[in-house]
Amino acid sequence: NYCMDVNNDGWDDLIRFDQPGGICVWYENPKNKDGLWKGRLIMASAGIENPAFVDVDKDGRNDIICSDAAAKQVVWLKSPTGRNDTAWQRFVISHVKDLATDRYTHGLGWGDMNKDGFNDVIIKSGWWQSPVNVKEADWVFHPADLGKDCANMIVFDADEDGDADVISSSTHDYGIWWHEQSPGGDGNPRWHTHEISRLFSQSHGLIVADINDDGHPDLITGKRFRAHNDGDPGAADAAVLYWFEYIPGKTPQWKPHLIDDSSGIGLSFVVKDVNHDGRPDIIISNKKGVFFFEQAKK
C-alpha cells in the first residue's frame, strides 16, 4: 500500500497492490464524505513482490516500478500530473521475458549505481541503467551478482570508498546483507556479499532512515509474521522488529536494537515522524495487526 494525492485534488488517496501478478488499484479519497472510496484500476497484472514507489522522472511526484506479469515486461508507471487527471502512463524498461518478469520476483531497488547522476533500477541479477530520457524503452542491463531472493534493495556507499554498494534482506530465509562493489580487472565491477545479521528470518521489507539523529542512515526491518504461514526457516520464531545502527568505516558495522518482539513487519511499512517531535516513528500493518511505534525521548 502507498499513499499519495493521485488526482491532484488536495486529498491523499490510497494505492493498493493485490497478490503479486494481480491488480493494482487506487482508491479516491471521498473528501470526508460517507461511503466507500471509489476504486480505479492502475494495472491489471502488477508483478514483483516489493514494487517501488519512487520519482522516476524527477517531476516531484512518485511513480511505480513493477513488472507486467502478463506481458512479461518490467515497466514504470508515471503518476497523473494534472488536477483531476486519473491516467497513469506506462513505459517499458525491459522486454526481456525471463528477467524479473515472474509475478513473484523478489528484489527491487532504485538508486544511482554508476554515479552518473541518474537513478537506476536494481534487481538481484543486475541493474538497468537509466537513460537521460527515462521514457525510452529497453534500458541497458548490467549483469551483477547481488545475492539471494530479497525485498527492497538499497543503494548506498556503505564502506565510504566512493562507489555504490547495495543492501538487501532475505524474504523467506535468514540474512541481511550488504553487497560491496569494487573495481574489476576487466573494467567491470566485482561484487562481494557481507552478512549484516541473521538474527531473524523473513525480513520482507527494508527501509533506511536516520533513527538516532546522528546524521547516518540506519536500517529498519523485522520478521514478516506468517509470511508463508509455515515452511520458511524460522517461521515459528518471534515476530520481531529491529533497527540497525550504522557505524561507518572501511569495514562498516550495523549494531542491532530490538524495538518489539510481538509485531514484525509486512510486505511494506512506513518510517515517518508522525507526531512532529523530530524523531522518526514506525507504522506497520501485517497479519498480526496494525501497530504504531512512537519513538520516545531518550
Predicted regions located by residue number:
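Beta-propeller-forming repeat regions
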Residues: 1-298
